[in-house]
Amino acid sequence: MKQLTILGSTGSIGNSTLSVVRANPELFKVTALVAGRNVREMAQQCLEFSPRYAAMSDEHSAKSLRLLLAEQGSDTEVYSGETAACELAALDDVDQVMAAIVGIAGLPSTLAAIRAGKQVLLANKESLITCGKLFMDEVKRSRAQLLPIDSEHNAIFQSLPERIQRQLGYSSLNENGVSRIILTGSGGPFRETPLSQFSDVTPDQACAHPNWSMGRKISVDSATMMNKGLEYVEARWLFNASAEQIEVVLHPQSVIHSMVRYHDGSILAQMGTPDMRTPIAHAMAYPMRVSSGVAPLDFCKVGALTFTTPDYQRYPCLKLAIDACNAGQAATTALNAANEISVMAFLDSKIRFTDIEVINRTVVEGLLLSEPTSVEEVLVIDRKARDVAAQVIAKLNN
């Protein structure tokens, strides 16, 4: 039985992970849960899964959780803060860590799991976007096992040779017969919306993804295709790929989650119903296969599968992310930080949908930054980019 710590248990990925645990109680045991401030949901999770430990992001939330659990007779030990999250990610008796805290806030605990040599199920893409080389160097040094959770990266992982799977981030694609990685994306809810209407898009409209059930931040990223741009950056690091070895293709049905093209002309694709429980179950049980609770794909109901080239006029954030990736780690760190601030401002109805790209571009092009050589330097770049993004938003609102 695998002992599991879930970082970000009350989020979308965290809940899907617990759903897989629920479907396979003989295979997985939850040892620790880590979340932000959603006390009531964390209390429900603790009562159902009886983890030994739980941690909230602040002491006020932790105190509220302790009171709720005490009323129910739970003996789960409750802690708070980043240090606690890092300690629970590195527990000696934990085999597997789901790294699903959204944003750069998830970086310290994800790194703690890596440094402890755990099997890390990576849903926190910001770890690679901001700390790609530093992160992969830690993976190699600690001999941790990295398994991607994003549906696209998990699909690529499943379609690659076992030799690359075992040496993720360091094997040569070319030497293993791989010609190119094909990253698919649905195009989001505004794939056919006239560009003239983009400035009037509301947060609720942006969060209404046609295929996937996701959190609000990642739903907006999908609408701008910034999510695909960040996945492009992540794929470059995860699979040791050059710019020439990755292409992005729009696939509105979200049935093929990504593909790998080989030198002999073959293309291997991973297909399935668009449900995050599938890649989560794959990574949790790897190299075995277990039930995810997802309904099987019915090809007769799916009908046609279509593909198109992304339009950068419609999706300028995608192009911005690809350009930032080619510029270096400082640029992708700044872009990620700016995007977190701009998306939050949009969700709070402080800016227009079209302002997201303007803010992101202004930050990336306006900051003169040297390449980071440590996590501390990455965090400095992150803070600078957030400050500049906030300043740009303030100017837009004046």
UniProtKB/Swiss-Prot annotation:
Role, per record: Catalyzes the NADPH-dependent rearrangement and reduction of 1-deoxy-D-xylulose-5-phosphate (DXP) to 2-C-methyl-D-erythritol 4-phosphate (MEP).
Domain of life: Bacteria
Keywords recorded for this protein, A-Z: Isoprene biosynthesis, Manganese, Metal-binding, NADP, Oxidoreductase
Record's protein name: 1-deoxy-D-xylulose 5-phosphate reductoisomerase
Molecular function GO labels: 1-deoxy-D-xylulose-5-phosphate reductoisomerase activity; manganese ion binding; NADPH binding
Enzyme class: oxidoreductase
Listed Gene3D superfamilies: 1.10.1740.10, NAD(P)-binding Rossmann-like Domain
Record-listed NADPH binding positions: T10, G11, S12, I13, G36, R37, N38, N124, E126, G215
A Pfam family it matches: DXPR_C
InterPro entries: DXP_reductoisomerase, DXP_reductoisomerase_C, DXP_reductoisomerase_N, DXPR_C, DXPR_C_sf, NAD(P)-bd_dom_sf
Lineage, broadest ranks: Bacteria, Pseudomonadati, Pseudomonadota, Gammaproteobacteria, Enterobacterales
Binding site for Mn(2+): D150, E152, E231
Chemical reaction(s) catalysed: 2-C-methyl-D-erythritol 4-phosphate + NADP(+) = 1-deoxy-D-xylulose 5-phosphate + NADPH + H(+)
SUBUNIT field: Homodimer.
Assigned protein family: Belongs to the DXR family.
Organism: Yersinia pseudotuberculosis serotype IB (strain PB1/+)
GO biological process, one term: isopentenyl diphosphate biosynthetic process, methylerythritol 4-phosphate pathway involved in terpenoid biosynthetic process
Entry annotated with the keyword Nucleotidyltransferase: no
Listed pathway(s): Isoprenoid biosynthesis; isopentenyl diphosphate biosynthesis via DXP pathway; isopentenyl diphosphate from 1-deoxy-D-xylulose 5-phosphate: step 1/6
Keyword Metal-binding set for record: yes
Annotated S-S bridges: none
Cofactor(s) needed for function: Mg(2+); Mn(2+)
